[in-house]
């Protein structure tokens, strides 16, 4: 058995500078390197099937697979950011070397190894979980709608009326997210989104603003100016 580096880097036990297990972290937890499978790069041939077909280690982290397919010329990398948008949203850019500064840590930015040996420098944001879980709650109440129907209701609602912080702790657990969104708006002195469309609009616009904020953080720490954002699926 082997462990592909991109998925290993999400464990927080990999040193992004060396691409190897961090002895400092392992020692702190009483672990040894031989507790883990040997590390390999994505694309490594690790064996063959009885039919002769090669067994190849792919990028085990789905976001790294998605970002590897990003249509970006080498000369445009420094001005390009990506947003892998699913239940979670991961917004970042590609670097040659990790950034391990205090500003980086305080901004909640992480260094994950990509499928091509580069660093995917990114921020984790709660994403379409807010839509998914709100839809489940409305269905539980007897109001079953498709995602397309929810989008249409959001489009029909008044814009730029109420906002939430998608990463606020009260939105992490399953349950009555529409009710929690209304309570957040009540607590922060904003208009309360009463209808389903208003709740959906609040979520979509809040995510858009959170993505903008993350891009500004990314730009401040890296010193880069981003002119292109590729939206991907992980």
Annotated model-derived regions:
Residues 1-2, 7, 12-28, 50-229:
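Active-site core segments that coordinate phosphate-bearing ligands/cofactors
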Residues 23-44:
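A conserved helix-loop-beta module that forms one wall/lid of the active-site cleft
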Residues 41-48, 226-234:
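Glycine-rich phosphate-binding loops at beta-strand->alpha-helix junctions
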